[in-house]
Curated annotation (Swiss-Prot):
Its cofactor is [4Fe-4S] cluster; [Ni-4Fe-4S] cluster. GO terms for molecular function: 3 iron, 4 sulfur cluster binding; 4 iron, 4 sulfur cluster binding; anaerobic carbon-monoxide dehydrogenase activity; ferrous iron binding; hydroxylamine reductase activity; nickel cation binding; oxidoreductase activity; peroxidase activity. This is Carbon monoxide dehydrogenase. It catalyses: CO + 2 oxidized [2Fe-2S]-[ferredoxin] + H2O = 2 reduced [2Fe-2S]-[ferredoxin] + CO2 + 2 H(+). GO terms for cellular component: cytoplasm; plasma membrane; protein-containing complex. It is found in: Cytoplasm; Cell inner membrane. Keywords: 4Fe-4S, Cell inner membrane, Cell membrane, Cytoplasm, Iron, Iron-sulfur, Membrane, Metal-binding, Nickel, Oxidoreductase. It is a peripheral membrane protein. Cluster B is an all-cysteinyl-liganded 4Fe-4S cluster; cluster C is a mixed Ni-Fe-S cluster which is the active site of CO oxidation. Cluster D is also an all-cysteinyl-liganded 4Fe-4S cluster that bridges the two subunits of the CODH dimer. It is an enzyme of class 1 (oxidoreductase). Allows growth in a CO-dependent manner in the dark. CODH oxidizes carbon monoxide coupled, via CooF, to the reduction of a hydrogen cation by a hydrogenase (possibly CooH). Induction: By carbon monoxide; under anaerobic conditions. The gene is cooS. Belongs to the Ni-containing carbon monoxide dehydrogenase family.
Length: 639
């Protein structure tokens, strides 16, 4: 293996330590593989390589000196547009499949099945029923669950093009629903939206880049619908998150425990594993693990159990291979999405078991344990016992757990934020937030979303941008691997607020934190959950917009994805634009091969839907542009 300089791979000290260990042991990681891919294809990076039919692949010369059309006659604008919207559709399919899984579980529960699950948050269930117009008076709980499941599954089944998805219609501001409805951007059916996107991008179909991009925005709104229903139903099923103190980074692993990582996105299994682990503690101790069982999280599954159970977060997407390198990981249990196929190859060098659980997501070299919700506890016990058995194969001489970890205050659901505000004003909880936006103590709000990528130093842009905006009194929210970056860097603490927040923001967070009984300020970055939980920020923003009597596109609210990587992130960014948010991406999407498409998403979209993309790889200038967008919105509100 070629020597690799690990110093600039990640801003996370734990990651650097483990990468040096990988280097010393000739173990290949994502950073090594990225280096071997250089130089990456310029045609693909610009979106100018088309592989849609077997006459290709066709490449368009970005400089205009070579081919201008594919064999079928598609020009650069069509090629770029249809590949972009296909990526958005794939992201939508991933998030909505997650949501479908939860909705089907709710349906089974309403029918008296799935005895290992129950409705843990009845108050949230009744709140959802009110939102969706389901009668509750004098009705049994399971009947209400059944109606909610039916309405939700209807968003995957409805064939009436004039009837928008129920969750979107009920959850957005009336002005946004009307605006998007008039533009034809409200999907009627999640599955149909994905299917239609694939159909219209088949060879010989839609060749109008503007029409294609509008179709992309429509399917992105289906992604928001799928995320909304996944988040809300998960809260009813597993509990709505409330603030909890946890910890983050590889130092959360324990030498004297059976360490089990849950990695992926769906809480159906990981939540049960957290419940069952306590029951098998004595078995772990009997096997020699004096500290019992230690569950740790990776990626969005990690955030699901972190905010509901206080489970510590080991790391985010790009460094998911590194917990194996500690020599102290007994098992990594994975379900769906963002799971590296390299994991079993690295695990072969250690005692770690990589356990896949979803029949649609298997990995060569991993051990597959099929997960059946009807036997959830039994499956969880099987997996945990596999990890306990692996503990006996651990080589103590190879254990190298980094000492570094950070305290993290997490679990700020929309309900938790409102509850904290209610400590200041019980009669009108949103008033303190509105008042402080109006008086300028809070200039605006930024939502950090998205992934990690090897194209930049891991986590660095997140941290730099958040500090820059917080200093200018911008309230910072985060989900997914963005939240993981902040947790690992210690920005989800009261101490970070004291150190980095501007005076206005610091005063607000201190007042609310003290009133809420935290004994100090709210954390600098507020953890809202996993990637589907971006819908929590939308719920909070919608409540704020409705209170002010404005649309979402009027609010001083922006989004940022400094390390945008996955197709899901493109879907998230696209619906953020569609609901009216200026949205920054720090990885250049494959659109620069088309001036028309680039202008559509960065300029024309602003006139059409209110939101637009800001593409900037430099955190400093990106922060300036986001802050300028916030100031433009404030001016529009007369602030």
């Amino acid at each position: 293996m070629t020597h690799h300089d690990c110093a600039h791979c990640s801003s996370d000290a734990c990651a650097t330590e483990m990468l040096n260990l990988a280097e010393a042991n000739s173990i290949e990681t994502a950073w090594h593989r990225y280096e071997k891919q250089q130089p990456q294809c310029g045609f693909g990076s610009a979106g100018l390589c088309c592989r849609i039919c077997l006459k290709g692949p066709c490449r368009i010369d970005p400089f205009g000196e070579g081919p201008k059309y594919g064999v079928c006659g598609a020009d650069r604008d069509t090629i770029v547009a249809r590949h972009l919207v296909r990526m958005i559709a794939a992201g939508t399919a991933a998030h909505s499949e997650h949501g479908r899984h939860i909705a089907l579980a709710m349906q089974h529960i309403s029918q008296g099945e799935l005895h290992d699950y129950s409705i843990r948050d009845e108050a949230k269930l009744y709140a959802i029923a009110k939102t969706l117009g389901v009668a509750t008076e004098g009705r049994g709980l399971l009947a209400i669950v059944g109606d909610l499941a039916a309405i939700t599954l209807g968003d995957f089944q409805n064939q009436d093009y004039d009837k928008p998805c129920a969750w979107l219609a009920a959850s957005l501001t009336p002005r946004r629903v009307k605006r998007l409805g008039d533009l034809g951007l409200l999907p009627h059916n999640i599955d149909a939206s994905v299917a239609q996107t694939m159909s219209r991008t088949h060879v010989g179909c839609d060749a109008d880049p503007t029409n294609l991009i509008l179709g992309g925005l429509r399917v992105a709104m289906a992604d928001l619908d799928g995320s909304m229903l996944a988040t809300e139903l998960s809260d009813a099923l597993f509990g709505t998150p409330q603030p909890v103190v946890s910890a983050a980074n590889l130092g959360v692993m324990k030498r004297g425990a059976v360490n089990i990582a849950v990695n992926g996105h769906n809480p159906m299994l990981s939540d049960i594993i957290c419940d069952v682990a306590a029951d098998l503690r004595d078995e772990a101790i009997a096997a020699g693990a004096a500290e019992g069982i230690n569950i740790i999280g990776i990626c969005c599954t990690g955030h699901e159990v972190m905010m509901r159970h206080g489970v510590p977060l080991a790391t985010n997407y790009l460094s998911q291979e590194l917990p194996i390198l500690t020599g102290a990981l007994e098992a990594m249990v994975v379900d769906v999405q963002c799971i590296m196929p390299s994991l079993p190859r690295i695990a072969e060098c250690f005692h770690t078991q990589i356990i896949t659980t979803d029949k649609h997501n298997k990995i060569s070299g991993a051990t597959h344990v099929p997960f059946d919700e009807h036997k959830a506890v039994e499956t969880a016990k099987t997996i945990i016992r596999m990890a306990i058995a692996a503990f006996g194969r651990r080589d103590p001489n190879r254990v190298a757990i980094p000492a570094f970890k950070q305290k993290s205050i997490v679990g700020f659901s929309a309900e938790a934020v409102v509850a904290a505000l209610a400590k200041v004003n019980a009669d009108d909880p949103l008033k303190p937030l509105v008042d402080n936006v109006v008086n300028g103590n809070i200039q605006g709000i930024v939502l950090f979303v998205g992934c990690n990528t090897t194209k930049v130093q891991q986590d660095s842009a997140y941290v730099d941008l958040a500090k820059s905006l917080a200093k200018r009194n911008v309230l910072v929210l985060a989900t997914g691997c963005a939240a993981g970056a902040f947790a690992k860097a210690g920005l989800m603490t009261s101490e970070a607020t004291t150190q980095y927040a501007g005076e206005g923001l610091k005063g607000v967070l201190s007042a609310i934190g003290t009133a809420a009984g935290l004994g100090g300020p709210l954390p600098l970055v507020m953890h809202m959950g996993s990637c589907v939980d971006n819908s929590r920020a939308v719920a909070l923003a919608t409540a704020l917009a409705n209170k002010l009597g404005v649309d979402l596109s009027d609010l001083p609210l922006v989004a940022s994805a400094p390390e945008c990587m996955s197709e899901k992130a493109l879907a998230i960014g696209s619906w953020a634009v569609t609901i009216g948010l200026p949205t920054h991406v720090g990885s250049v999407p494959p659109v620069i091969g088309s001036q028309i498409v680039t202008k559509l998403v960065t300029e024309t979209a602003k006139d059409l839907v209110g939101g637009y993309f800001i593409v900037d790889t430099d955190p400093k200038s990106a922060g300036d542009k986001l802050y300028a967008a916030i100031q433009e919105r404030r001016a529009g509100l007369g602030l």
